[in-house]
Regions:
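Conserved ABC ATPase "signature" region
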Residues: 24-44, 152-156
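Interfacial catalytic loop of ABC nucleotide-binding domains
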Residues: 44-49, 167
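Conserved ABC ATPase signature
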Residues: 48-53, 57
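A short, proline-enriched helix->beta-strand linker immediately N-terminal to the Walker B motif
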Residues: 68-72
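ABC-type ATPase nucleotide-binding domains, specifically the catalytic core motifs of the NBD
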Residues: 5-25, 35, 39-40, 135
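P-loop NTP-binding/switch modules centered on Walker-like glycine-rich loops
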Residues: 75, 79, 83, 87-167
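Charged, flexible cofactor/metal-binding loops and thiol motifs
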Residues: 137-226
Length: 226
């Protein structure tokens, strides 16, 4: 949100640009959308500036703005970053409800695996700008049927309540390479404990190894790895 313009002027601008509504109709639509996303006293909020709203309230305004023109696809890039756990839960519930009520598809871009597990139907894991694994979310989180070593590393690095005391988390070694100095072959090979000479020389393609499950790896089956 632009800090020098009121919430209303920014929300109405989007409606006027993308619909044939006049200013009065756009104002009414803005009030309707703020009500839909759970903002109390919507007409008063439209006259306020972003700094006068809480972080969670500003997030709701952004969602209202994104949905005001009835899009078929909502792209949510880190929608819960910097929000406390309570507000995060409210925002996720709101987006889930809107998805069901409006039939809007949501593309989540996030590093929060908990959000993915809760919200997604399908998940695409990316590394160095490439999709390295794509599968139904239940395969990754529910059945532990993940196949790519990077996905494995992400999941192993999450603290678990049932982990015995004294067991250290299995962090992924190394660091993500600079985008202007990417390694030859598989981009994850320098950090992969299963990498072979083939991985370091050749770049794997994204292949479907099971129905609905794609992976970019020469050794997608765990039994094939050293």
């Amino acid at each position: 949100l632009n800090p020098v313009f009121t919430v209303g002027s920014q929300l109405i601008e989007a409606i006027l640009l993308h619909t044939d509504k006049n200013k009065k109709e756009a104002w009414a639509r803005a009030v309707e959308m703020l009500t839909l996303v759970g903002v109390n006293e919507p007409e008063s909020r439209l006259k306020q500036y972003p700094h006068e709203l809480s972080g969670g309230m500003r997030q709701r305004v952004m969602i209202a703005m994104a949905l005001a023109c009835n899009p078929r696809l909502l792209i949510a890039d880190e929608p819960t970053t910097a929000l406390d756990v309570t507000i995060q839960a409210q925002i996720l519930k709101l987006m889930n409800d809107l998805k069901k009520e409006k039939g809007t598809s949501i593309l989540f871009i996030t590093h929060d695996l908990g959000v993915i597990n809760e919200m997604a139907d399908d998940v695409a894991v990316m590394y160095c700008g490439q999709v390295v694994e794509k599968a139904p979310v239940r395969s990754i989180f529910g059945d532990n049927s993940y196949l790519h070593p990077y996905t494995e590393g992400l999941l192993y690095s999450i603290p678990r309540l049932d982990t015995p005391t004294g067991i250290r988390l299995e962090a992924i070694p190394g660091a993500v390479p600079h985008p202007l100095d990417l390694p030859k072959g598989c981009k994850f090979a320098p950090r992969c404990k299963y990498a072979t000479d083939k991985c370091r020389e050749m770049e794997p393609e994204l292949n479907e190894v099971e129905p609905g499950h794609m992976v970019r790896c020469f050794y997608p089956k765990k039994g094939e790895r050293n």
